[in-house]
Amino acid sequence: VMLSGHTDVVPVSGQDWDTDPFSLTESSDKLYGRGSADMKGFIALVLSRVPEMVSTELTKPIHLAFSYDEEIGCVGVQRMLDLLEHQPIKPSCCIIGEPTGMEVVIGHKGKLATRVKVRGHACHSGQSPLGVNAIDFASELIVYIRKLAHEKSQNGPFDKDYEVPYTTLHTGVVGGGTALNIVPNLCQFDFEIRHLYEEDPQHLLDQIENFARDHLENEMHLIDSDTGFDFETLATYPGLLTDPGIEFVTYVKGLLDNNAHSKVIFGSEGGLFQKRLGIPTLVCGPGNIDQAHKANEYISLEQLEKGGNFLDCLLESLVLS
Protein backbone atom coordinates (compact mmCIF):
# COMPACT_ATOMS: atom_id res chain seq x y z
CA VAL A 1 0.00 0.00 0.00
CA MET A 2 1.49 3.34 -1.04
CA LEU A 3 0.68 6.51 0.91
CA SER A 4 1.48 9.55 -1.19
CA GLY A 5 1.77 13.28 -0.65
CA HIS A 6 3.69 16.37 -1.74
CA THR A 7 6.01 18.31 0.56
CA ASP A 8 5.97 21.67 -1.22
CA VAL A 9 3.57 24.56 -0.65
CA VAL A 10 2.38 27.60 -2.58
CA PRO A 11 3.90 31.03 -1.76
CA VAL A 12 2.40 33.41 0.80
CA SER A 13 3.47 36.62 -0.93
CA GLY A 14 0.64 39.10 -1.32
CA GLN A 15 -1.50 37.35 1.30
CA ASP A 16 -2.61 39.04 4.52
CA TRP A 17 -2.08 36.48 7.29
CA ASP A 18 -3.15 37.01 10.89
CA THR A 19 -0.36 34.71 12.10
CA ASP A 20 3.09 33.68 10.91
CA PRO A 21 2.25 31.31 8.02
CA PHE A 22 5.34 29.20 8.70
CA SER A 23 4.79 28.77 12.43
CA LEU A 24 1.96 26.41 13.29
CA THR A 25 -0.62 28.22 15.42
CA GLU A 26 -3.49 26.56 17.29
CA SER A 27 -6.68 28.52 17.84
CA SER A 28 -10.32 27.46 18.35
CA ASP A 29 -9.63 23.78 17.57
CA LYS A 30 -7.87 24.68 14.32
CA LEU A 31 -4.23 24.59 13.27
CA TYR A 32 -3.18 27.55 11.12
CA GLY A 33 -0.19 27.59 8.78
CA ARG A 34 0.80 27.34 5.16
CA GLY A 35 0.27 23.77 3.99
CA SER A 36 -1.78 22.72 7.01
CA ALA A 37 -4.75 21.82 4.82
CA ASP A 38 -2.75 21.06 1.67
CA MET A 39 -1.52 18.52 2.69
CA LYS A 40 1.05 18.51 5.44
CA GLY A 41 -1.54 17.38 7.97
CA PHE A 42 -1.74 14.04 6.16
CA ILE A 43 2.04 13.76 5.91
CA ALA A 44 2.40 14.51 9.64
CA LEU A 45 -0.15 11.82 10.49
CA VAL A 46 1.65 9.28 8.31
CA LEU A 47 5.09 10.08 9.73
CA SER A 48 3.79 9.87 13.30
CA ARG A 49 2.85 6.26 12.63
CA VAL A 50 6.13 5.19 11.06
CA PRO A 51 7.47 3.61 14.29
CA GLU A 52 4.37 1.41 14.46
CA MET A 53 4.67 0.56 10.76
CA VAL A 54 8.28 -0.52 11.28
CA SER A 55 7.70 -2.52 14.46
CA THR A 56 4.55 -4.32 13.29
CA GLU A 57 4.58 -7.42 11.11
CA LEU A 58 2.30 -6.59 8.18
CA THR A 59 0.64 -8.72 5.51
CA LYS A 60 1.59 -6.07 2.96
CA PRO A 61 4.35 -3.45 3.18
CA ILE A 62 3.49 0.23 3.39
CA HIS A 63 5.36 2.55 1.03
CA LEU A 64 5.69 6.28 1.66
CA ALA A 65 5.91 8.35 -1.53
CA PHE A 66 6.53 12.03 -0.79
CA SER A 67 7.28 14.31 -3.73
CA TYR A 68 8.25 17.94 -4.33
CA ASP A 69 7.21 20.65 -6.82
CA GLU A 70 3.68 19.29 -7.12
CA GLU A 71 2.26 22.80 -6.98
CA ILE A 72 3.95 23.83 -10.22
CA GLY A 73 2.55 20.94 -12.22
CA CYS A 74 3.51 17.60 -10.65
CA VAL A 75 7.14 18.11 -11.65
CA GLY A 76 9.06 16.44 -8.82
CA VAL A 77 7.15 13.17 -8.88
CA GLN A 78 8.53 12.40 -12.34
CA ARG A 79 11.82 11.19 -10.83
CA MET A 80 9.91 8.91 -8.49
CA LEU A 81 7.91 7.53 -11.41
CA ASP A 82 11.13 6.83 -13.33
CA LEU A 83 12.43 4.86 -10.36
CA LEU A 84 9.25 2.90 -9.70
CA GLU A 85 8.76 2.12 -13.38
CA HIS A 86 11.84 -0.11 -13.35
CA GLN A 87 11.10 -1.92 -10.09
CA PRO A 88 10.20 -5.62 -10.45
CA ILE A 89 7.38 -5.24 -7.91
CA LYS A 90 5.18 -2.16 -7.66
CA PRO A 91 2.70 -1.09 -4.97
CA SER A 92 -0.69 -2.74 -5.41
CA CYS A 93 -2.59 0.47 -4.61
CA CYS A 94 -2.06 4.13 -3.76
CA ILE A 95 -3.83 6.56 -1.42
CA ILE A 96 -3.04 10.23 -2.00
CA GLY A 97 -3.76 12.32 1.08
CA GLU A 98 -4.96 15.53 -0.56
CA PRO A 99 -7.70 17.25 1.47
CA THR A 100 -11.04 15.59 0.74
CA GLY A 101 -12.64 15.78 4.18
CA MET A 102 -11.70 12.10 4.58
CA GLU A 103 -14.03 11.04 1.78
CA VAL A 104 -13.05 8.81 -1.12
CA VAL A 105 -12.31 10.62 -4.39
CA ILE A 106 -12.05 8.45 -7.50
CA GLY A 107 -11.53 11.10 -10.16
CA HIS A 108 -10.22 14.51 -11.12
CA LYS A 109 -9.51 16.33 -14.36
CA GLY A 110 -6.15 16.48 -16.08
CA LYS A 111 -4.27 19.69 -16.81
CA LEU A 112 -2.19 21.17 -19.61
CA ALA A 113 -0.65 24.58 -18.92
CA THR A 114 0.91 26.48 -21.83
CA ARG A 115 2.86 29.73 -22.24
CA VAL A 116 2.48 31.64 -25.50
CA LYS A 117 5.06 34.21 -26.61
CA VAL A 118 3.97 36.51 -29.41
CA ARG A 119 6.77 38.12 -31.44
CA GLY A 120 5.70 41.38 -33.04
CA HIS A 121 7.44 44.22 -34.87
CA ALA A 122 8.02 47.43 -32.92
CA CYS A 123 7.69 50.94 -34.27
CA HIS A 124 6.55 54.39 -33.18
CA SER A 125 2.85 54.43 -32.36
CA GLY A 126 2.38 57.17 -34.94
CA GLN A 127 3.39 54.57 -37.54
CA SER A 128 1.34 51.75 -36.02
CA PRO A 129 0.13 50.35 -39.37
CA LEU A 130 3.80 49.66 -40.21
CA GLY A 131 4.31 47.52 -37.11
CA VAL A 132 2.99 44.21 -35.82
CA ASN A 133 1.27 44.75 -32.49
CA ALA A 134 2.07 41.67 -30.39
CA ILE A 135 -0.65 42.53 -27.88
CA ASP A 136 -3.29 42.78 -30.59
CA PHE A 137 -2.45 39.37 -32.01
CA ALA A 138 -2.18 37.82 -28.55
CA SER A 139 -5.65 39.19 -27.85
CA GLU A 140 -7.04 37.57 -30.98
CA LEU A 141 -5.68 34.19 -29.90
CA ILE A 142 -7.03 34.68 -26.37
CA VAL A 143 -10.47 35.39 -27.84
CA TYR A 144 -10.19 32.18 -29.87
CA ILE A 145 -9.31 30.22 -26.71
CA ARG A 146 -12.38 31.73 -25.05
CA LYS A 147 -14.46 30.63 -28.04
CA LEU A 148 -13.22 27.05 -27.63
CA ALA A 149 -14.07 27.22 -23.94
CA HIS A 150 -17.61 28.30 -24.78
CA GLU A 151 -17.98 25.46 -27.30
CA LYS A 152 -16.94 22.96 -24.62
CA SER A 153 -19.47 24.38 -22.19
CA GLN A 154 -22.24 23.97 -24.76
CA ASN A 155 -21.31 20.76 -26.55
CA GLY A 156 -19.33 18.77 -23.98
CA PRO A 157 -18.59 15.95 -23.54
CA PHE A 158 -20.01 16.13 -20.03
CA ASP A 159 -19.43 14.33 -16.75
CA LYS A 160 -22.20 15.16 -14.29
CA ASP A 161 -20.08 14.05 -11.32
CA TYR A 162 -18.08 17.29 -11.55
CA GLU A 163 -19.12 20.71 -10.30
CA VAL A 164 -18.07 22.00 -13.74
CA PRO A 165 -19.02 18.98 -15.87
CA TYR A 166 -16.94 19.71 -18.98
CA THR A 167 -13.40 20.53 -20.10
CA THR A 168 -12.45 24.15 -19.44
CA LEU A 169 -9.95 26.57 -20.99
CA HIS A 170 -8.77 29.66 -19.14
CA THR A 171 -6.22 32.44 -19.73
CA GLY A 172 -4.75 33.51 -16.41
CA VAL A 173 -1.67 35.70 -16.97
CA VAL A 174 -0.97 38.34 -19.64
CA GLY A 175 1.96 40.72 -20.04
CA GLY A 176 3.38 42.90 -22.79
CA GLY A 177 4.37 46.33 -24.02
CA THR A 178 6.83 48.89 -22.68
CA ALA A 179 5.29 52.29 -23.45
CA LEU A 180 2.07 53.66 -24.91
CA ASN A 181 3.88 55.33 -27.81
CA ILE A 182 5.61 52.13 -28.94
CA VAL A 183 3.89 49.35 -30.88
CA PRO A 184 4.77 46.33 -28.70
CA ASN A 185 7.06 43.70 -30.17
CA LEU A 186 6.39 41.16 -27.43
CA CYS A 187 3.40 39.83 -25.53
CA GLN A 188 3.26 36.74 -23.37
CA PHE A 189 0.32 34.93 -21.82
CA ASP A 190 -0.37 31.69 -19.99
CA PHE A 191 -3.44 29.55 -20.42
CA GLU A 192 -4.53 26.17 -19.16
CA ILE A 193 -6.79 23.33 -20.19
CA ARG A 194 -8.51 21.35 -17.41
CA HIS A 195 -9.79 18.33 -19.27
CA LEU A 196 -12.02 15.40 -18.55
CA TYR A 197 -10.25 12.08 -18.16
CA GLU A 198 -11.35 10.77 -21.55
CA GLU A 199 -10.41 13.90 -23.51
CA ASP A 200 -7.01 14.48 -25.10
CA PRO A 201 -5.89 18.08 -24.40
CA GLN A 202 -3.42 17.88 -27.27
CA HIS A 203 -6.36 18.03 -29.68
CA LEU A 204 -7.41 21.40 -28.26
CA LEU A 205 -3.82 22.65 -28.21
CA ASP A 206 -3.44 21.66 -31.86
CA GLN A 207 -6.54 23.70 -32.72
CA ILE A 208 -5.12 26.73 -30.93
CA GLU A 209 -1.70 26.40 -32.57
CA ASN A 210 -3.25 25.88 -36.01
CA PHE A 211 -5.38 29.01 -35.63
CA ALA A 212 -2.27 30.99 -34.71
CA ARG A 213 -0.24 29.61 -37.62
CA ASP A 214 -2.89 29.54 -40.34
CA HIS A 215 -4.82 32.71 -39.58
CA LEU A 216 -2.81 35.11 -37.45
CA GLU A 217 0.78 34.54 -38.58
CA ASN A 218 -0.17 34.92 -42.24
CA GLU A 219 -1.32 38.45 -41.51
CA MET A 220 1.71 39.20 -39.34
CA HIS A 221 4.13 38.02 -42.02
CA LEU A 222 2.82 40.59 -44.50
CA ILE A 223 4.87 43.10 -42.52
CA ASP A 224 7.65 41.01 -40.95
CA SER A 225 8.36 37.32 -41.57
CA ASP A 226 10.19 37.04 -38.24
CA THR A 227 7.02 37.64 -36.27
CA GLY A 228 4.92 34.80 -34.92
CA PHE A 229 3.94 32.59 -32.01
CA ASP A 230 5.99 30.33 -29.74
CA PHE A 231 4.28 27.74 -27.54
CA GLU A 232 5.87 26.29 -24.40
CA THR A 233 4.39 23.59 -22.17
CA LEU A 234 4.63 24.69 -18.54
CA ALA A 235 3.05 21.67 -16.88
CA THR A 236 0.93 18.68 -17.72
CA TYR A 237 -0.59 15.79 -15.85
CA PRO A 238 -3.33 13.30 -16.73
CA GLY A 239 -6.73 13.04 -15.13
CA LEU A 240 -7.60 10.35 -12.63
CA LEU A 241 -10.48 7.93 -13.00
CA THR A 242 -10.66 4.83 -10.81
CA ASP A 243 -13.43 2.27 -11.11
CA PRO A 244 -15.50 2.63 -7.91
CA GLY A 245 -16.33 -1.07 -8.04
CA ILE A 246 -12.80 -2.44 -7.66
CA GLU A 247 -11.76 -4.21 -4.47
CA PHE A 248 -9.30 -1.48 -3.42
CA VAL A 249 -11.98 1.24 -3.39
CA THR A 250 -14.38 -1.00 -1.49
CA TYR A 251 -11.60 -1.77 1.00
CA VAL A 252 -10.89 1.91 1.73
CA LYS A 253 -14.59 2.72 2.00
CA GLY A 254 -14.89 -0.08 4.54
CA LEU A 255 -12.08 1.40 6.64
CA LEU A 256 -13.87 4.75 6.56
CA ASP A 257 -17.31 3.23 7.13
CA ASN A 258 -18.53 5.46 4.31
CA ASN A 259 -19.71 4.08 0.98
CA ALA A 260 -19.76 7.44 -0.83
CA HIS A 261 -17.29 8.60 -3.48
CA SER A 262 -16.91 11.68 -5.66
CA LYS A 263 -14.80 13.57 -8.20
CA VAL A 264 -13.08 16.87 -7.42
CA ILE A 265 -12.04 20.09 -9.16
CA PHE A 266 -8.38 20.00 -8.10
CA GLY A 267 -5.64 17.81 -9.50
CA SER A 268 -3.10 15.45 -7.95
CA GLU A 269 -0.30 13.09 -8.86
CA GLY A 270 -2.82 10.25 -8.90
CA GLY A 271 -3.31 10.18 -12.65
CA LEU A 272 0.45 9.74 -13.11
CA PHE A 273 0.60 6.76 -10.74
CA GLN A 274 -2.40 5.26 -12.50
CA LYS A 275 -1.39 5.97 -16.10
CA ARG A 276 2.37 5.36 -16.01
CA LEU A 277 2.57 2.63 -13.41
CA GLY A 278 -0.87 1.03 -13.58
CA ILE A 279 -1.38 1.45 -9.83
CA PRO A 280 -5.04 1.72 -8.72
CA THR A 281 -5.22 5.12 -7.03
CA LEU A 282 -7.69 7.18 -5.06
CA VAL A 283 -7.51 10.46 -3.15
CA CYS A 284 -8.48 10.63 0.51
CA GLY A 285 -7.10 12.90 3.20
CA PRO A 286 -7.96 15.24 6.06
CA GLY A 287 -8.88 18.88 5.56
CA ASN A 288 -10.88 20.91 3.09
CA ILE A 289 -9.56 22.11 -0.27
CA ASP A 290 -11.52 25.36 0.25
CA GLN A 291 -8.93 26.32 2.89
CA ALA A 292 -5.91 25.60 0.69
CA HIS A 293 -3.70 28.27 -0.94
CA LYS A 294 -5.41 31.08 1.03
CA ALA A 295 -4.34 33.42 3.81
CA ASN A 296 -5.01 31.88 7.22
CA GLU A 297 -5.03 28.35 5.81
CA TYR A 298 -6.00 25.84 8.48
CA ILE A 299 -6.99 22.28 9.26
CA SER A 300 -9.37 21.39 12.07
CA LEU A 301 -8.33 19.09 14.88
CA GLU A 302 -11.44 17.06 14.12
CA GLN A 303 -10.19 16.36 10.59
CA LEU A 304 -6.77 15.37 11.89
CA GLU A 305 -8.42 12.97 14.31
CA LYS A 306 -10.43 11.41 11.49
CA GLY A 307 -7.30 11.08 9.38
CA GLY A 308 -5.41 9.48 12.23
CA ASN A 309 -8.23 7.02 12.92
CA PHE A 310 -8.23 6.02 9.26
CA LEU A 311 -4.49 5.32 9.27
CA ASP A 312 -4.87 3.31 12.47
CA CYS A 313 -7.63 1.23 10.86
CA LEU A 314 -5.45 0.76 7.78
CA LEU A 315 -2.54 -0.49 9.88
CA GLU A 316 -4.80 -2.77 11.90
CA SER A 317 -6.21 -4.29 8.70
CA LEU A 318 -2.68 -5.11 7.53
CA VAL A 319 -1.41 -6.68 10.74
CA LEU A 320 -0.35 -10.29 10.27
CA SER A 321 -2.64 -12.34 12.52
Where do the model's predicted regions map?
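Active-site metal-coordination/substrate-binding segment of hydrolases
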Residues: 2-63
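Short, conserved micro-motifs enriched in small and acidic residues
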Residues: 31-43, 51, 71, 132-135, ...
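Acidic/histidine-rich catalytic neighborhood of metal-dependent amide-processing enzymes
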Residues: 39-113
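Acidic-glycine-rich active-site phosphate/pyrophosphate-binding loop
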Residues: 12-26, 91, 106-117, 282
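Structural motif
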Residues: 1, 30, 63, 92-95, ...
